[in-house]
C-alpha cells in the first residue's frame, strides 16, 4: 500500500502544472464522528462525537489529462474526531491529508456540482480518553497505547461551487485499518473511526 501511495505522488509530481490549472484555498467544517470497536465478537459503537476540521487545500484542473470537468484536490487538515459514551468521550486529533479525484458538472457560469473520492492518510497528534470520576475529569493518552497513530482510509464528497470561489459540501470518511493496539489472548480486537462531515471552502 505504501508503494502505491508513493507511486501516485511521484506521478502527480511529474505533471507540469500551470498557474491557470492550480487553485489554492482554505477549508473548514463540522464533524460527526463515531468510534466503532469489536472485541471478542462483541460490537460497540459510540454516540456521535462533534468535532471540526480546518486547513488549506489545493485544486488542480485535470481536463488536460482526462476529459473536461475532472480535477484533483488535496488538503492538509487538522481533523478532530472521536467518540462519545455515557460518562466519557474520546478526542482523536489527526493531521490529515486527503487526495481526491473529482468531477465538476457546470450548470451555469455561477453554479457547479462537485463529486470526488479518494484516499486519506492521517497522523494522530492528539488522543485522549476523557472520563468523569467523582466529578473530576481524568484524561488518558490513547495513541501508542490503545490506538495506533497512523490511519489510512477512504473519503467521499458531494457539493456545489458558486461564483467559482465558494464551495459547500457533505462528506464521509472511514478507516480501512484496524486502529486497535489492544491484545487479548485467544481473541481479536478491532477499532475503526467513521466520520460524516459538512464543510465549506473558499478558493482564491
Where are these regions (language model features)?
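Residues that define the transmembrane beta-barrel architecture of outer-membrane proteins
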Residues: 20-22, 48-54, 91-97, 111, ...
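Repeated loop/turn-to-beta-strand initiation elements of outer-membrane beta-barrel proteins
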Residues: 64-70, 164-170
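Outer-membrane beta-barrel "beta-signal"
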Residues: 31, 192-204
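Transmembrane beta-strands of outer-membrane beta-barrel pores
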Residues: 30-36, 78-82, 105, 119-127, ...
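Bacterial Sec-dependent N-terminal signal peptides
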Residues: 1-27, 200, 204
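Surface-exposed strand-loop-strand hairpins of Gram-negative outer-membrane beta-barrel proteins
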Residues: 32-54, 147-148, 181-187
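Membrane-embedded beta-strand positions of outer-membrane beta-barrel proteins
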Residues: 24-28, 54, 72-76, 99, ...
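Outer-membrane beta-barrel proteins
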Residues: 15, 59-64, 102-107, 162-164, ...
Amino acid at each position: 500500500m505504501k508503494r502505491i501511495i508513493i507511486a501516485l505522488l511521484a506521478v502527480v509530481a511529474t505533471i507540469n502544472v500551470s498557474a491557470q490549472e492550480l487553485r489554492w484555498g482554505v477549508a473548514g467544517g463540522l464533524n460527526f464522528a463515531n468510534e466503532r470497536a469489536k472485541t471478542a465478537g462483541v460490537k460497540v459503537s459510540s454516540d456521535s462525537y462533534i468535532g471540526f476540521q480546518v486547513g488549506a487545500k489545493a485544486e488542480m484542473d485535470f481536463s488536460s489529462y482526462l476529459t473536461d470537468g475532472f480535477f484533483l484536490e488535496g488538503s492538509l487538515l487538522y481533523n478532530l474526531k472521536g467518540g462519545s459514551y455515557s460518562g466519557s468521550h474520546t478526542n482523536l486529533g489527526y493531521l490529515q491529508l486527503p487526495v481526491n479525484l473529482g468531477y465538476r458538472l457546470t450548470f451555469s457560469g455561477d453554479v457547479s456540482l462537485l463529486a470526488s473520492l479518494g484516499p486519506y492518510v492521517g497522523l494522530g497528534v492528539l488522543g485522549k480518553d476523557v472520563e468523569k470520576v467523582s466529578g473530576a475529569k481524568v484524561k488518558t493518552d490513547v495513541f501508542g497505547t490503545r490506538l495506533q497513530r497512523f490511519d489510512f482510509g477512504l473519503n467521499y464528497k458531494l457539493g456545489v461551487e458558486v461564483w467559482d470561489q465558494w464551495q459547500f459540501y457533505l462528506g464521509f470518511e472511514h478507516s480501512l485499518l484496524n486502529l486497535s493496539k489492544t491484545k487479548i489472548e485467544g481473541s481479536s480486537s478491532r477499532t475503526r473511526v467513521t466520520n460524516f462531515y459538512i464543510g465549506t471552502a473558499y478558493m482564491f
